[in-house]
Amino acid sequence: MSSSTVITNIAALVTNDPSLGDHSPLGLVRDAAVVVEGDRVVWTGESSKAPATDNRVDADGRAVLPGFVDSHSHLLFAGDRTEEFNARMSGRPYSAGGIRTTVAATRAASDAELEAGLTRYLAEALRQGTTTFETKSGYGLTTADESRALRVAARHTDEVTFLGAHIVAPELADDPAAYVDLVTGEMLDACAPHARWIDVFCEKGAFDGDQARAILTAGKARGLHPRIHANQLSYGPGVRLAVELDAASADHCTHLTDADVDALANSRTVATLLPGAEFSTRAQWPDARRLIDAGATVALSTDCNPGSSFTSSVPFCIALAVRDMGMTPDEAVWSATAGGAAALRREDVGRLVPGAYADLTLLDAPSHVHLAYRPGVPLVAGVWRRGVRKV
């Protein structure tokens, strides 16, 4: 039998269970404790009521919240696009290939190089409180390169997404229909065994609504669950397609009609917002307030990728969401934990309740609000993943 540990003297415990504590969506418990046994939470509540345990950890009056759930990232890549970012931020034209630059570098990298990069970024995210990671392929765009990326990812996370439909592969740029046939045929056959999800970039210059529907429908037929890059750069069919196909998440959601917002609010599809992308491209911010007020479920994620959002920091994204997207600190923290779990259709992460994984983030602050109140400050003082302290 596993030994038990109580983490006690917690100033403010975010459980994301509204039946607990202050009965808010965060289920905030003051002067709290958490009991962990093995890889699971077995008890949460007030410190004075905590059961006896084998071990004790003193939180010393600091805040504890669920480990962040980063439900959208692109960590399987090689190369660097510093010059592109520098030119964009300096207002200079830049003619290099964008995603295609990363595709070329990723194809040229060895498996060991891809894995080293992935593990480096995962460790970086873990140090900042992220305990559940989704990541995608999408920088290979050949059957061999997409499938090897997914095999590498599957060694490190259960949340692996096949994104062969990121852009049309450069060698088939003049024949996008042939590339869709490749993605839905040979490439899907090779990639489906290594992924849980299928994704598509539904946007002008990438894949239109009909192409996206064909790709996601083919993936569903192979047992992959759909998610979609939707309505990032322009108004389009992505969000409504996500709802139609019961996608777990529609990601970006910057350009939304009233009908798009209503569709999300009346569905299980989560609107995953990615403020790192807007920060890094100086683009229009998504209107989180509009979505939340309409009743949509919102998640916050990093979109960590080498081109448009090279950050693995969920705390940074929380601060951006509060400052620039109309979210309250409570809403942003919920969206980065329970919201991310909803975007992955998970109930065992993003919450600190009996039966959930013991994924906890300890802050060097008395309240979760400090994540937005003190942007840029390294507040994460400890991280437990599956009951084991990692930081």
Swiss-Prot record:
It is an enzyme of class 3 (hydrolase). It is found in: Cytoplasm. One of its GO terms (molecular function) is imidazolonepropionase activity. GO terms for cellular component: cytoplasm. Pathway: Amino-acid degradation; L-histidine degradation into L-glutamate; N-formimidoyl-L-glutamate from L-histidine: step 3/3. N-formimidoyl-L-glutamate binds at residues 139, 305, 307. Fe(3+) binds at residues 72, 74, 229, 303. It catalyses: 4-imidazolone-5-propanoate + H2O = N-formimidoyl-L-glutamate. Its EC number is 3.5.2.7. Its cofactor is Zn(2+); Fe(3+). 4-imidazolone-5-propanoate binds at residues 81, 139, 166, 232, 308. Zn(2+) binds at residues 72, 74, 229, 303. The keyword Nucleotide-binding does not apply. Keywords: Cytoplasm, Histidine metabolism, Hydrolase, Iron, Metal-binding, Zinc. Its main location: cytoplasm. GO terms for biological process: L-histidine catabolic process; L-histidine catabolic process to glutamate and formamide; L-histidine catabolic process to glutamate and formate. HAMAP family: HutI. Catalyzes the hydrolytic cleavage of the carbon-nitrogen bond in imidazolone-5-propanoate to yield N-formimidoyl-L-glutamate. It is the third step in the universal histidine degradation pathway. Belongs to the metallo-dependent hydrolases superfamily. HutI family. PANTHER family: IMIDAZOLONEPROPIONASE (PTHR42752), IMIDAZOLONEPROPIONASE-RELATED (PTHR42752:SF1). This is Imidazolonepropionase. The gene is hutI.
